[in-house]
């Protein structure tokens, strides 16, 4: 498993499992909203009134509507008022 996947998959899985509403910002500035239905190595399936398959290489930022705990013993990821994700409890 690549090092970049060690946080990405648990984060997306927590959002999917808990059905947390998210705002997904694309690299071209477009904002998509919905819940994560599924994901794999290359795409995220985002559900709102319709399902959209969004390629991960087009995603800039994923902002959850509320705090989410990532993995066992992991930290909380929360969204702030500036639409940026913050990590409160990650060891460095």
From Swiss-Prot:
> What domain of life does the UniProt record list for this protein's source?
Bacteria
InterPro entries (alphabetical): Hfq, LSM_dom_sf, Sm
Q: Does the keyword Ligase apply?
A: no
Listed GO biological process terms: regulation of DNA-templated transcription; regulation of RNA stability; regulation of translation, ncRNA-mediated
User: Which cellular component, as a GO term, is one annotated location?
Assistant: cytosol
Could you cite one Gene Ontology molecular function of this protein? Answer: RNA binding
Sm domain ranges (all copies): 9-68
Annotated region Disordered: the residues are 72-92
Coiled-coil region(s) at which residues?
Answer: none
Query: Keywords on this record?
Result: RNA-binding, Stress response
Name the PROSITE patterns on file: SM
Q: Which family does it belong to?
A: Belongs to the Hfq family.
| Role according to the record | RNA chaperone that binds small regulatory RNA (sRNAs) and mRNAs to facilitate mRNA translational regulation in response to envelope stress, environmental stress and changes in metabolite concentrations. Also binds with high specificity to tRNAs.
- Subunit-level organization: Homohexamer.
Annotated PANTHER family: RNA-BINDING PROTEIN HFQ
The protein's name in its UniProt record:
RNA-binding protein Hfq
- Which species? Xanthomonas campestris pv. campestris (strain ATCC 33913 / DSM 3586 / NCPPB 528 / LMG 568 / P 25)
Upper taxonomic lineage: Bacteria, Pseudomonadati, Pseudomonadota, Gammaproteobacteria, Lysobacterales
């Amino acid at each position: 498993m690549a090092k970049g996947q060690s946080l990405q998959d648990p984060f997306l899985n927590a959002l999917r499992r808990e059905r947390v509403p998210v705002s997904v910002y694309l690299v071209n500035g477009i904002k998509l909203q919905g819940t994560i239905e599924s994901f794999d190595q290359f795409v995220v399936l985002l559900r709102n009134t319709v399902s959209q398959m969004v390629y991960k290489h087009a995603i800039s930022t994923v902002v959850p509507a509320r705090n989410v705990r990532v993995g066992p013993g992991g930290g909380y990821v929360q969204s702030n008022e500036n639409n940026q994700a913050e990590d409160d409890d990650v060891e460095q």
